[in-house]
From Swiss-Prot:
Key words, A-Z: Amino-acid biosynthesis, Cytoplasm, Isomerase, Methionine biosynthesis, Nucleus
Species, as recorded: Candida glabrata (strain ATCC 2001 / BCRC 20586 / JCM 3761 / NBRC 0622 / NRRL Y-65 / CBS 138)
Name recorded for this polypeptide: Methylthioribose-1-phosphate isomerase
Gene that specifies this protein: MRI1
Pfam family, one: IF-2B
UniProt cross-references to PANTHER family, sorted A to Z: METHYLTHIORIBOSE-1-PHOSPHATE ISOMERASE
Domain of life: Eukaryota
Site residues by UniProt (Transition state stabilizer): C182
Catalytic residues (positions): D284
């Protein structure tokens, strides 16, 4: 089975790299990659949410700077649509610095992009010329991508092992289910995923436990007997990342899943034949006290889980930690255009076959459909802030952080 890729980065020749990103607005029926040549291209795909997920945003942002630098070193530098004096390195440095600020404005809530651009500024300030900057930036971006993938696998195993050991301590030995919201998998990262990475690790572990006697079976993460046998992804309105993207990944990986409405969480807990033992969510920013900014709807999921005694975990790499901001109330929450709430985009479907209707190019026909009165006022925040008090653990690549005896997180080791 081919691995899902949100970002196609061809880097065999460091002097002639190419970047394209999967247009996630067209999923699940259409697979189309958008080439990235400049910082403007990176800004556009991030702003329009053609690429999303905090780690992927940071990677695409960094890659767009690399691509513009490569373009400046070629005869096609005029395509950047931005004035550089190529005979003056200080001018180039100043202009790139301005461009980094512009790029950051594409999605201000996600700390990963800010952290990556801060690192690029260090690379920029230490370079003596454009070629050196581009070469060092190539090394930085490659490390950013490779570290992200390796860290995702570590996070997945850390979170899965922690939950399974927790269930073992509770003498819980049954099959169980988990919640997740938005999309935190391969489509939101360099691969494997954060919160969805934990779910992948839980599923891989459950399969190893059903293969007794098979000498080629995978090593179990723990000796506990519970198995995750079902995932309940929330649809995640209004952009439907859960129904369009997470469901797409779960089907792709043959992980048993049932898509549920955002408004059905409590009722699903009360009526599920399979006990729901945990929720795993991603993060766009985690501040010093553990308050977490994530996709709108995360807070209500956390509150409901708290009410029903279901463990709630945030899964994110250290690059998502905001080392400066003390509390969630100080996080700037991005508000999106009203039409993104009032208008939905999707593929036309044949009601007899449930298959997409194709055009003359054999591609699914897409359309925008209004679902609200034209003149109704709309409040459309992209994120909400979940207080640390609702979070049972923060899963990172270096381990799982829980609260101390005073009920507080100490994340200083991640700073």
């Amino acid at each position: 089975m081919n691995a899902l890729r949100a970002i196609d980065f061809k880097r065999d020749d460091p002097n002639n790299v190419s970047v394209s990103v999967l247009d996630q607005l067209l999923l699940p029926y259409t697979t189309k990659y958008i080439p990235i040549y400049t910082i403007d291209d990176g800004f556009t795909v991030i702003k329009k949410m053609q690429v999303r997920g905090a780690p992927a945003i940071a990677i695409v942002g960094a890659l767009s700077v690399l691509m513009e630098s490569q373009l400046l070193l070629s005869e096609g530098f005029c395509k950047t649509q931005y004035y550089y004096n190529l005979n003056d390195w200080e001018n180039i440095r100043s202009k790139i610095d301005e461009r980094l600020a512009f790029l950051l404005s594409s999605r201000p809530t996600a700390i990963n992009l800010s952290n990556a651009l801060d690192e690029i500024k260090i690379v920029l300030d230490s370079a003596s010329d454009l070629q050196t900057f581009k070469n060092n930036l190539f090394d930085y971006v490659c490390k950013l991508i490779d570290d992200d993938f390796a860290n995702n696998k570590r996070m997945g195993d850390n979170g899965a092992e922690f939950l399974l050991n927790l269930l073992k301590k509770e003498n819980f030995n049954e099959d169980f289910a988990v919640f997740t919201i938005c999309n935190t998998g391969s489509l939101a990262t360099s691969g494997y995923g954060t919160a969805l990475g934990v779910i992948r690790s839980l599923w891989n572990d459950s399969k190893s436990k059903t293969q007794e006697g098979n000498p080629n079976k995978k090593v179990k993460l723990t000796e506990s007997s519970p198995k995750m046998v079902q995932v309940f992804p929330l649809e995640t309105r209004p952009y439907n990342q859960g129904s369009r993207l997470t469901a797409y990944e779960l089907v792709h990986d043959d992980i048993p899943a049932t898509l549920i409405p955002d408004s059905s969480i409590a009722y699903k807990i009360m009526t599920s034949k399979i006990p729901i033992k945990a929720a795993f969510v991603g993060a766009d920013r985690i501040v010093r006290n553990g308050d977490t900014a994530n996709k709108i709807g995360t807070l209500q999921l956390a509150i409901i889980c708290k009410q029903f005694g279901i463990k709630f975990f945030v899964v994110a790499p250290r690059t998502t930690i905001d080392k400066v901001t003390e509390e969630g109330k100080d996080i700037i929450v991005e508000e999106r255009n009203a039409n993104e709430f009032k208008i939905v985009t999707g593929s036309a479907v044949d009601m007899q076959t449930n298959k997409p209707i194709l055009d003359e190019k054999n591609e699914p026909i897409t359309a925008k459909v209004g679902i609200a009165p034209e003149n109704i006022n709309v409040w459309n925040p992209a994120f909400d802030i979940t207080s640390f008090e609702y979070i049972d653990g923060i899963v990172t690549e270096v381990g799982v952080f829980t609260k101390n005896e005073n009920g507080n997180f100490d994340l200083s080791a991640l700073h």
